[in-house]
Amino acid sequence: MPGILPMKVIKVGNSSQSRIAQACDRCRSKKIRCDGIRPCCSQCANVGFECKTSDKLSRRAFPRGYTESLEERVRALEAEIRELKDLLDEKDEKLDMLSKMHSNRSRSAEPPRSTPAAEIKRDSGTPAKEDTFRVQASPLLLGVENSDSYFMGASSGRSFIETFKRKIQENGKSCTDFNPEAFLHIQGCYPLSTKLAPQSMRIPPRLFSDRCVNVYFQEWAPLFPVLHKPAFLRVYEEFVADPEKIKNNHKLTQLYLVFSIAGLSSEQPDFQQLAACETQWHKSLEAVLMDNTMLTLQCLILALMYCTVRADYKRLQYYKGIAVGLSHRLGLHQSQKRFSFGALTIETRKKVFWTLYTLDCFSAAILGLPKLLKDEDVHAEFPSDTDDENVTEKGFQPSLPGEPTRISSALALFRGSRILGKVLEKIYPAATSYELSLQQMSSLEGELTEWFENLPQHLKLNFKQDKPSTDVTGSRSPLLALAYYYTRILIYRPAIASSLGPKAAPALMSVAESSKSIVQIVQLLEERSMSFSFCLNKADILIVCGMALLYQTLGLKHDSKVLKDNEKLVNSVVKIVTKVNAPGSYDFKRIAGMLVTVEESLPQSLPTPPRQSPEACMPTPPAQQGSPSPSAVDRGAQPNLARQSSASLSETDLIVQRDKLLGMAVTPQHQQYQHQQLQQQHKNELSRARSQTSFDNLRQKAQQMRPHHRHSLSHAQVAQAALMGRTSTGTQSTPNLDYLSLSSPQSPVSPVQMRSQPHQLQQQQQQQPQPQQQQQQHQRSSIASSHSQQGQMFPQKTSTGMSTAEWEALVRSLDGGPVSLYTAIYGGPALAPLETPSSATQSSATAWGQDPWDMSSFNLGDFVPGAPTAQSVLSLSEESISSCDDVPSSDMGLNNGNMDYRNTLLPVTSAGTNNFLLDGLHGYGL
């Protein structure tokens, strides 16, 4: 009935279709759709039939997909509840700590009741005496112990590291290996490359330079708008067209500094190329340091950015002093309204100055030194919220309404830097001894929090469940949040280990929470593959944050939720700083292991059977990387070829060839087994011969295959090398894999050489069916004659890489099936080689024949019509070792009859594969 809700409606999976949980009896018996309206469904109402629903179903009331979706939702909710429970436990633990401290503090500060209200009234500007503490500047000087020693103040984190060391000693732990000078690049920065950059790297590759320019203007320029993008791109176009024509030192300095900054912040920097770029901009910058121009100041600011990321603090202070003096000389600190410049010049001057101010504040905090730009001297206005493309000398061009600009992130950072400047002046003055109060710190934190909360929505990083949200599309919002937490750490860090005692616990909690957020932000940037494009050294700030987290764990119980959370974060810090090979990473890991459980890196597991190719488990020899291989064909792309006897070397062929070459006696049981295998092979050959038609497409397909014939190591060579490692003695030399073994008949022959034998063997089987002994003798004589012909046509190189006994052990392992071969190659009991025949001799020297290119015995008439054609003939050219597919049979006047090789041609392999074909051995684990 209309207006009456139906029964329970369920949805199947994620689709839009829905149905009721159970149909009525009539609809179910007639197998028609029931809408489930109660008390009577539409189908029953149309015919006037009583609608009844009886619960006689033997099947499930709900579909399986619906139940599984409910189970998945339950699991997700359980996981979310566990996270929230851990988070609440952590918050409760912190609240308990704060409530205990607040209760003790209120009781001690409670005034007597008899005191009049007028007498207990305090001046709001005067902090309580018990909230004030005195800070004594550290007398530590770093470097050599003479007048050349240099100073690092408390804002650098050096004093906190000393405090952390004392705290560990107070807890009864040994600190003999704790060297504070191992951190913060106190010993200086390492050179980018120990090798001298070649002259060819003076001009970077186009791919490298394009990527660096793109990264710089996407990641760095929005926060540090020191360059005018259109003007720089015009210079870059000139550089790309002809690098030798760029002679201007300002242009060269800007170009190579952009390459260096962007390249250094990439995930895997090319240090040798960066060293070449660093050499170029050093030379160009030194040539223009005395020029009092805006271009020189822009170059100096770029150098400051590079030195900050590079942690080259010596050059940083040197370049900053010149840059600040030059900005004063150019009048950038003054109000720009006083000057009659064009709009583009005015905006450029504002952007350059405030970028310099930001770098001055952060570099002063890093080095622990006073700022060089004093706030009372700064009267410059902030730049307008307009991007470079919309600013000209004549004025501003309209932009899209409601669309956020790129420079908006820089404006937010400039305002945050003003607060950082106040923090440095009030919390870290240059005085030797000064007083600080918790009220003063809270006031600065309030101003900082107001700035952070008033950020535009596209620049605000939201935290969900105490973790940064992952719905970010760029690095600007995470980096602005990083600046906020870094400044918050600087505000509260002096209170740690001060004379406040337990009253400093809120400050420690603020520092630890901010350190936790910074580590999470760096993790977010790495997970999203975004650059750490900020004026801080990532390793230094992570190590200081990790020490703050370790400092907090010293006062926690072993089952504390906060301690477990800090342990995870410290392990993340260890992984990141170890990956970038930062100075002090090993010392930090050792110190962290004293306080928390540090996860050790998992050792590399032993090699396992390869699923696709052994190259994934075995490194390629250096000499083999550039040489082609005649059988370099992707095995995975040709599954049918392994099952065709004419296109692969079967086990029987290997046995016959082995018996011929090694002169071994064949037992009757062995001969009977060979005869059965030959009969089966003969049947397969006859069935395939009926479908053979022509050889027309061989040249075209071979040319398609030829570009993919360059690989590193064939399956036969991998098996041979693996067996050598288990069966050879200590006096035997390592097999030379730089060439394919073309051994003489006295030496063992690899499976690659024997690929041309099956066709001759199979033709003899088709034409001359003989008794067992005669057939085998005829095959052996045919193989011997073919080898003698090959020896005449192609002189063979003697190989000493593998002894006869070892090759015999490998071939004999084929009789045991895949398990035996796997054991021979990947481990297990060593294969016992058979008795070495007298014909197998080892030679300690490799030598070619006296006349290796003698073709006197070669005759084209030998290639008569109907003669079997070898599947692959090796070229003995020194330039390449590849199949002779370059010369088709038609060009040599050869007639292959009606033989059709279309179904046996190798398919074109992918260019990125390094797999090889070992014919006939796919079933044996290779």
Curated annotation (Swiss-Prot):
A biological process term (GO) from this entry: DNA-templated transcription
Comment, domains: The glutamine-rich domain might function in activating gene expression.
Protein name: Transcriptional activator protein acu-15
Function: Positive regulator of acetate induction.
SUPFAM superfamilies noted in UniProt: Zn2/Cys6 DNA-binding domain
Biased composition (Basic and acidic residues): 119-129
DNA-binding region: 24-51
Superkingdom classification of source: Eukaryota
Organism: Neurospora crassa (strain ATCC 24698 / 74-OR23-1A / CBS 708.71 / DSM 1257 / FGSC 987)
Any one GO CC term of the record: nucleus
Subcellular location: Nucleus
Keywords recorded for this protein, A-Z: Activator, DNA-binding, Metal-binding, Nucleus, Transcription, Transcription regulation, Zinc
Record GO terms (molecular function): DNA-binding transcription factor activity, RNA polymerase II-specific; sequence-specific DNA binding; zinc ion binding
Pfam families, A to Z: Fungal_trans, Zn_clus
Gene name as annotated: acu-15
Region (Disordered) location: 100-129, 602-649, 667-801
Biased composition (Low complexity): 623-632, 669-681, 740-792
Xref: PANTHER family: REGULATORY PROTEIN CAT8, TRANSCRIPTION FACTOR PDR1
Polar residues bias (residue ranges): 689-703, 726-736
